[in-house]
Amino acid sequence: MAHTFSCFADASLVRTTGGSVRGYRFDGLDIFKGIPYAKARRFHAPEPAVWDSVLDATSYGYVCPLLEMPKPNGEMLVPHRYWLMDEACQNLNIWTPALDDAHRPVLVWLHGGGYFAGSSIEQIAYEGENMARLGDCVVVSINHRLNILGYFDLSDFGAEYANSGNAGGDDIIAALRWVRDNIAAFGGDPGNVTVFGQSGGGAKVTTLLQTPAADGLFHKGIVMSGVLGRLADCTGSGRDCAEALMAELGAADIAALETVPYAALAAAYNKVAPALKAAGKNTGCAPHPNAFYLGDPLENAFRPETARIPLLVGTVFGEFAAFNGFGLNKAQMSAADLPFLDVLFREPTMRYIRRRAETGPVWSYFFNQDFTIEGGRAPWHCSDIPFVFHNTELVPSANISGVTPQLEQQIFDAVLAFARTGNPQHSGIPTWPASTPQQENTMLFDSATRLAPNHDKALIAAALPAISALMARNFDPDSIQH
């Protein structure tokens, strides 16, 4: 296949609120990578980024440093990419069909990895080219602060650290403000922004709905495997963790922690955090409920200000089937094993959908397609991402003879229909009504896509008590790295 590329001084040049940026033209798209949307001191709120000369936006920006070096995990199933890490990671990428005034729908991708890992380019399936070209939309992906850089509560140490436990969420909001103020120059509609994400990225969508500062910055949300029943408890003070870090590093105060080299900070954290976590202390790495973030809606109710925002919410059948010790092919799993593999996500997702349906439109989906790789596998956590981005061609494990082309188009068209109209219905799938508090109208996406009201409700309810007890003993969500 022949490709076209151009990058000239006067081409793909856009003036933004921070300064001018130059991207490049590739196969009919204007592409911009690594645009700074903010800057921030460690543990502090982000501020707008500005520059004087034309910024070269032709390569990806830094990604957030991790607490541990990434380990290859399931590369055949979820191909990864790794990149330069630095705390100056507040940057975004844009794919757009044209720099015009077409006011295309805008889709802003929030990456997975919990709140402690991942990046905007971690998975090859995150590439926005096909979505932008085939969907005639503008795709944005962002990097932001993670782990103790983004979610370390230091509010006990002074007003300047009042929201350090949500610095990563504050970065995301800064990126959405940048999109609001600049995306029209990239051919997008600032009045039609959909935030979508998978796993930790999906959880970030639910967090934004509970964050008043995000109001008006997005208009629809897609939550893919993002409602998890058991996360780290970050409701308490982070004082104990901070004091343990200061003692380990010989730092006199929090200001000294701001200047410690990140590698030393991460090493100290990895040394002191396990015992603190075991003792039930707040060790960071997840949003901290306060006036900025109002907490999990399943515990604290949905905010009325965002209750009418349309949502598309779902999971995949296997979820952690391929990770965290569940590396079994389908022939090795008994019927009793299978509910365990999806109930961690599916059960709280079902509750979320029903509760959300009390106040606003929400559509339910379930990715149910088995794969042929390694003798046959149930769909795993992340296996739906290539279908959403129309990127199955980039992920060999996603290619199923006689199935993938149609299934990919069904899912992709549902996502684009939702981004355009707030309803995922399109001509290539059965009638798909929104869910109600009494009935979860779930679209099962597989080789025979169909609507399945209240899918697996009775099965999961019956299995939940035993499974919950097992998970409480054996499951640590921080151990998952995809």
Where are the regions a protein language model picked out?
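Active-site loop->helix "elbow" adjoining a glycine-rich segment at hydrolase catalytic centers
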Residues: 112-113, 167-171, 199-202
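Non-catalytic accessory segments of hydrolases
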Residues: 1-166, 190, 375, 398-411, ...
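Substrate-access "cap/lid" subdomains that shape
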Residues: 181, 215, 220, 224-354
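Short glycine-enriched nucleophile-adjacent loop
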Residues: 202-214
